[in-house]
Amino acid sequence: MNILVINGHLDKESYCQAIFQTIVENIDSKRHELEMINLNEEEFDPVLRYGYRQRMEDDPFILRSQELIQWADHFIFVYPIWWSSIPSLLKGWIDRVFTPGIACSTNNRGSFILNYLRGRQFKKLLKGKTASIYATSMAPTWWYKVFSGPINIPDSYGI
């Protein structure tokens, strides 16, 4: 199995970094292929400047991330929960990497968003892939159950 481990914490001395390192060190290399993305070591623009209506300039890190997303069978996300959500750096990476054509596609012409709103079907290009999430928080679990609902990666990508 091809496994991609993504660390979404900005601090290189964080508990998430320790979890990330432990996961990487303990994956059985005889049974699995492993790749890693440690967002706190990368320099990239996490801002999706034009939504998906206009293509942004190619960024080598984003292109490599998209290759790894297509390569992986299983994703492991490690990140803290801040303000009941994922860190902005991880959110920006998801916005820039899980784009139409990588995460999903439509056979219809025109705007991806308008086609979606009109109920037109789109193909899930990552179907069959799995993920694990290691999310840390300083708040008790009941806080998220009461105020935020289930903790998950934003599901607006149709993955």
Show which residues each predicted segment covers.
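N-terminal beta-loop-helix "entrance" segment that forms/cooperates
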Residues: 39-57
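Helix-loop-strand module that forms the ligand-binding subsite of alpha/beta enzymes
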Residues: 57-154
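Short, solvent-exposed amphipathic alpha-helices that sit
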Residues: 18-29, 147-159
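Cofactor-binding loop segments of dinucleotide-utilizing enzymes, especially the Rossmann-like FAD-
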Residues: 8, 39, 136
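Flexible, glycine-rich phosphate/dinucleotide-binding loops
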Residues: 12, 43, 140
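N-terminal beta1-alpha1 ligand-phosphate binding loop
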Residues: 1-32
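Short beta-strand "acidic-cap" motif of Rossmann-like dinucleotide-binding folds
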Residues: 36
